[in-house]
């Protein structure tokens, strides 16, 4: 079975094509903390867009915010029940087949 709408670059886009999918994909693929600026650079989104999404995800407790020497870092909350699912979606790779194309 083929799923042409599922992107290997960002499988979350099939659920949400917006900034949320970009942020979740970055956080789901990385064990380290990222700043809003770093995520914005990696996704070609504005820092303010990314920051708004991160604030909402922190409120839901899916994402943790860590402050170190004036620098805010964000990462998935390992205790949240959706974290492993977010990681699994972020790591998803669809095998592309030319069969039947």
List each model region and its residues.
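Short helix-capping/hinge SLiMs at alpha-helix to coil transitions
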Residues: 14, 27-31
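Short alpha-helical segments that sit at the start of domains
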Residues: 1-22
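A short acidic, leucine-rich amphipathic alpha-helix
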Residues: 38-42
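Short, Lys/Arg-rich nucleic-acid/phosphate-binding segment
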Residues: 67-73, 77-79
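A short, conserved structural fragment
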Residues: 58-68
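Conserved segment of winged-helix/HTH DNA-binding domains
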Residues: 77-101
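Short amphipathic alpha-helical interaction segments
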Residues: 45-58
């Amino acid at each position: 079975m083929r799923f042409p709408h599922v992107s290997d670059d960002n499988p979350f886009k099939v659920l949400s094509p917006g900034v949320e999918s970009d942020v979740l994909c970055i956080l789901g693929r990385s064990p380290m903390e990222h700043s809003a600026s770093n995520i914005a650079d990696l996704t070609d989104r504005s820092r303010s867009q990314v920051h708004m999404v991160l604030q909402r995800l922190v409120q839901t407790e899916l994402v943790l915010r860590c402050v170190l020497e004036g620098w805010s870092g964000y990462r998935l909350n390992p205790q949240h029940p959706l974290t492993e699912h977010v990681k699994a979606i972020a790591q998803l790779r669809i095998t592309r087949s030319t069969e039947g194309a």
